[in-house]
Amino acid sequence: ETVICIEQDSELIDFSEKIAIQNSMNNIVFIKNELKKGYPDQGPYSCILIEGAIEEVPDVILNQLAEGGRLVTILNKDENGAAMKFSRINNEVISQFLFSMDAPLLEGFKKSKKFKF
């Protein structure tokens, strides 16, 4: 199977491509795109891994999950981090707490501020 890696940093893509070639990892494709958008052109995906903490999973990424697909990430809520698994079952997304942990917040994944009365 092909592994699609999304990165917004061109230098990191270049570095990663060199490492993949040196290690004969021929099934990896690196794509420059905003992380929070994912890459719907090749979806739906059976597995999505967001490596870093986020404050919310954007719907645009959840919509890229195939039926039976899973997304794993670290969700930060109120200064507390949790490894979470999101699964698409019967066209609904179900979340499951895995364990507590912290990681740096990924750029572009801050929760959008909402107006409150």
Regions found by a protein language model. Give the residues of each.
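Substrate-binding/catalytic lobe of Class I Rossmann-like enzymes that use SAM or dcSAM, i.e.
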Residues: A83-F117
